[in-house]
Swiss-Prot record:
GO terms for cellular component: cytoplasm. Keywords: Allosteric enzyme, GTP-binding, Hydrolase, Metal-binding, Nucleotide-binding, Tetrahydrobiopterin biosynthesis, Zinc. One of its GO terms (biological process) is tetrahydrobiopterin biosynthetic process. Its EC number is 3.5.4.16. Belongs to the GTP cyclohydrolase I family. GO terms for molecular function: GTP binding; GTP cyclohydrolase I activity; zinc ion binding. The gene is gch. It comes from the Eukaryota. This is GTP cyclohydrolase 1. It comes from Ostertagia ostertagi (Brown stomach worm). It holds the Pfam family GTP_cyclohydroI. Zn(2+) binds at residues 104, 107, 175. Toroid-shaped homodecamer, composed of two pentamers of five dimers. It catalyses: GTP + H2O = 7,8-dihydroneopterin 3'-triphosphate + formate + H(+).
Amino acid sequence: MASESGFLSSDSSSEDCDQKIIAFSKKTSNLDKMTAAYSSIISHVGEDVNRQGLLKTPDRAAKAMLYFTKGYEQQLDDILNDAVFDENHDEMVIVRDIEMFSLCEHHLVPFNGKVHIGYIPNKKVLGLSKLARIVEMFSRRLQVQERLTKQIATAMVQAVQPAGVAVVIEASHMCMVMRGVQKINATTSTSCMLGVFRDDPKTREEFLNLIHK
């Protein structure tokens, strides 16, 4: 809480510090448990977790998994960080070829590809880098491509309340390459069209033509 002078009170500062300590303790506890779990997995596939090449693998794998899923710790407001600006521009804005990496929630193997985002502002625009950060936040979770596509589009609506949003993701799934049907060249495309992109075929067609130029 701020005092009359405008400075944070010692109680507020102490509370923030306590929350950071709790978050750090929880993360450390999670890391220890995940390290033990990876050690168990390695052992159960028939490997010796004590041999030189694998001694630090459980710890490395646990840290990597925490990084791959760091999106669970992020919120949209934190990502936006006040980068929403008043602007009268009312024509299409497109950021295409945003690289994306995620983990399939079914087999915990990667899928990666590119995200194309278009929107038509309604008196507000979003800092361009924030579109990439929105993609990063949702892709750094256990995902399916269909849900990821919709989450990105919904976040754009929450951020700037545009006249319309279009999101297309084109990705390759390692669960189709490394196992199962083992189709190396297969790609999956998903889309989410909201507002004018859903209601107006010409607007939708313009977006699709522009992202594939």
